[in-house]
C-alpha cells in the first residue's frame, strides 16, 4: 500500500522523468532485453538494436502508462484496466516480465537522477512499480 509520502515521492520523481519518456523507456527496454534475453520473445517483429525506432516507440508507451498511473495514483487499477486486459488476454506476457522491466526502469532513473533517487524515493518508486505490475497481472487469475 502506498502511503501519502510514497505518493508524493512518486509524483515528484515522475515530474523529473516525464520529459524524457521516450529515452528512459527505450533505455529500460534495452536493458531488459540484454539482461533478461528471454523477454525478447514477446517482440519477434521488433528491430531490437540500440536506437531502434520500434524500441523507442514502445518505451515511450511504457513510460506514458507509468506517468498516467502516477497521475492517477489513487486509482492505478482503473487507469490501467485496458492495458491489463491487453497484456493478460491478447499478448499473454509472462507476469514476471513486469517485475524485470520495473527493475530496469529503476536503474535508468538512478543513472539519470542519482541525487533525486534518495533511499526513500527509491523505496516509494519500487512500491509503485510493484503496484503497477500487480495491476497488470491481476487479470491473469
UniProtKB/Swiss-Prot annotation:
Q: Which GO terms describe its biological process?
A: hydrogen peroxide catabolic process
PROSITE patterns reported in the protein's UniProt record: GLOBIN (PS01033)
Write the record's keywords in alphabetical order, separated by commas.
Heme, Iron, Metal-binding, Oxygen transport, Transport
UniProt keyword annotation of Cell cycle present: no
Residues binding O2:
58
User: Where are its TM segments located?
Assistant: none
Q: Name one GO molecular function term.
A: iron ion binding
Q: How does it assemble?
A: Heterotetramer of two alpha chains and two beta chains.
Q: What does this protein do?
A: Involved in oxygen transport from the lung to the various peripheral tissues.
Q: What's the protein called, per UniProt?
A: Hemoglobin subunit alpha-A
**Organism, per UniProt?**
Francolinus pondicerianus (Grey francolin)
Task: Report which gene this protein is encoded by.
Answer: HBAA
Amino acid at each position: 500500500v502506498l502511503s501519502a509520502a510514497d505518493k508524493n515521492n512518486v509524483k515528484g520523481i515522475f515530474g523529473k522523468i516525464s520529459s524524457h519518456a521516450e529515452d528512459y523507456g527505450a533505455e529500460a527496454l534495452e536493458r531488459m532485453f540484454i539482461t533478461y534475453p528471454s523477454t525478447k520473445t514477446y517482440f519477434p517483429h521488433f528491430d531490437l538494436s540500440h536506437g531502434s525506432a520500434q524500441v523507442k516507440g514502445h518505451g515511450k508507451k511504457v513510460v506514458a502508462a507509468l506517468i498516467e498511473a502516477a497521475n492517477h495514483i489513487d486509482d492505478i487499477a482503473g487507469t490501467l484496466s485496458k492495458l491489463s486486459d491487453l497484456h493478460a488476454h491478447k499478448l499473454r506476457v509472462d507476469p514476471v516480465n513486469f517485475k524485470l522491466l520495473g527493475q530496469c526502469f529503476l536503474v535508468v532513473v538512478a543513472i539519470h537522477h542519482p541525487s533525486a533517487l534518495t533511499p526513500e524515493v527509491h523505496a516509494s518508486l519500487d512500491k509503485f512499480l510493484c503496484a503497477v505490475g500487480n495491476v497488470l497481472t491481476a487479470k491473469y487469475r
